[in-house]
Amino acid sequence: MSMITEIYAREILDSRGNPSVEVEVFTEDGGFGRALVPSGASTGEHEAVELRDGDKSRYLGKGVLKAVANVNDTIAPELIGYDVFDQNAIDAKMIELDGTPNKAKLGANAILGVSMAAAHAAADELGLPLYTYLGGFNAKTLPTPMMNIINGGSHADNNVDFQEFMIMPVGAPTFREALRMGAEVFHALKSVLSGMGLNTAVGDEGGFAPNLKSNEEAITVILEAIEKAGYKPGEDVYLAMDVASSEFYDKSTGKYELAGEGKSLTTAELVDFYAELVDKYPILSIEDGCDENDWDGHKLLTDKIGHKVQLVGDDLFVTNTSKLAEGIEKGIANSILIKVNQIGTLTETFDAIEMAKKAGYTAVVSHRSGETEDATIADIAVATNAGQIKTGSLSRTDRIAKYNQLLRIEDMLGDVAKYDGIKSFYNLKK
């Protein structure tokens, strides 16, 4: 046992220049932990609440001084004296202090900062890497990365409706080689886009954000880049998409408005469109294919292609075990996206991953579009042997920080390190 002696929060900036929360935790025996909290752009309406000040005179109303004060004035006095190694008790106390179902009182950004910083302090005191502290001796699987190399939707200022077009280097023997393959495809894509006279500026997550003729053209230019880099689509590298369809779903008409293509689709038409893309291209994963409240649409999509494509629930499940349990019961999707700030504590995050695995669902540990240099999610991915991680493109230090941490972890693990690649998709029949 080692008691927490000090907790301190401050306002910092994230990768979009918006304020976020940083928390430091100190223990009586010299343990120290620091954590920085991320922020999303396309957020699910059922996510835990990110507390913002609303004071238009500071940071356009996006300040987080209220959340910082909640850590320093409310949470800290209650947790001083707690055993830093008792993560469950720490998180449970903060949930109790908040007292709301969605952490609206104290803010998920306040609670999560303390939760992660406490884990870092505990690991530091024991002299252990965070992934070992969180996952034990069997934490050894490096995640297959989903690399977002074309950004659209809410993550870019372009005409592409779908939010993310990603590559997954499943044919690599190690994480290090997977990262190299992804970087080479990324650079090849820049060359392809430049050759087409298209913009090669990057979006929030480091991917390119060109104006394209259609969502399908994003797929074809990536396939060209994969081949240009010397790899085989559908063998060395597969594709994944985060459609983020809630962002273009019109509740008043019940239709999906693909403004970039001038199309208005019913749920059934959208599902048929996905099925056509999957038949035509090596797409292995689709995230949030239907609106977060269109559960009938998600069921239709799952029944149609769920046997051969990973269908990831992000806004659908919001890292929430009650939402996930409902999805499992109804046979909706087959994977969950794990975002620590959607739920707000490490214990609840780990509960969601465990529930998914027990049900035969995969779990994809994920960043947010507003990120920091914090690389905790890299350790979480290995600690839980999640098998997959989604942490942006091959540019922007806020994204690369996670990849570099995974390289360090792979080195530390040495010969016991595993990289499952295509085997990460263990619930598909493709």
Swiss-Prot record:
Where are the catalytic residues? Answer: 205, 339
The beginning of the lineage is: Bacteria, Bacillati, Bacillota, Bacilli, Bacillales
- The species this protein belongs to is Exiguobacterium sp. (strain ATCC BAA-1283 / AT1b)
Among HAMAP family, the record links this protein to: Enolase
What family is it from? Belongs to the enolase family.
**Could you tell me what this protein is called?**
Enolase
Name the Gene Ontology biological process terms. Answer: glycolytic process
| EC code(s) of this entry | 4.2.1.11
Q: Which domain of life is it from?
A: Bacteria
Does the record bear Repressor in its keywords?
no
What keywords would UniProt list here? Cytoplasm, Glycolysis, Lyase, Magnesium, Metal-binding, Secreted
**What gene is this protein a product of?**
eno
The cofactor note from the UniProt entry for this protein is: Binds a second Mg(2+) ion via substrate during catalysis.
Show the Pfam families listed in the entry: Enolase_C, Enolase_N
Positions bound to Mg(2+):
242, 287, 314
Q: Which cysteines are joined by disulfide bonds?
A: none
InterPro entries named in the record: Enolase, Enolase-like_C_sf, Enolase-like_N, Enolase_C, Enolase_CS, Enolase_N
Q: Is Cytoplasm among the key words of this record?
A: yes
